[in-house]
Amino acid sequence: MTQVIQLKRYEFPQLPYKVDALEPYISKDIIDVHYNGHHKGYVNGANSLLDRLEKLIKGDLPQGQYDLQGILRGLTFNINGHKLHAIYWNNMAPAGKGGGKPGGALADLINKQYGSFDRFKQVFSESANSLPGSGWTVLYYDNESGNLQIMTVENHFMNHIAELPVILIVDEFEHAYYLQYKNKRGDYLNAWWNVVNWDDAEKRLQKYLNK
């Protein structure tokens, strides 16, 4: 009996709000292109590479007719792109529902480590502004130390960073802001704080605290 080899494909998630919901802080045009163009492209890219990997595993691709390292690198890039964007969308909420300050355990950890939310916001923003080129700034929970850690990531083709216990993330690729803010990334970051979904960030933290 021949064993069936099948790799599960990724699904393009539904945006948790309308494309104009984050205005005036992030424009409808940006969300439309970012979500329907770039994010969908990562999902399609990952699935296309899974098709190729599946054929390779089955022996349908003769040796010398594929670049295994290229497939694996491409999968890392596209899977990270998909998963990080899924977190990014849910990490934001429409104007009026997002922004402000966190509460609960997240607020307690921030105050314990930074003394105040304002100081945390300053350090996170400075970290984001210091990122050279495109990438992400990530707040994640370190399971070993119990600390919140800030990390900047150039691009997303190195390791599966999306599998970290991510609490909060901001996209710093130009497609996330250039249509509205041009080369003023700092203005985009300042605007982004007004749509941060702290309820989602708290839920993500609770999930990791309860493991």
UniProtKB/Swiss-Prot annotation:
Transmembrane segments: none annotated. This is Superoxide dismutase [Fe]. Its EC number is 1.15.1.1. It holds the Pfam family Sod_Fe_C. Homotetramer at high temperature; homodimer at room temperature. Signal peptide: none annotated. Its main location: cytoplasm. It is an enzyme of class 1 (oxidoreductase). The gene is sod.
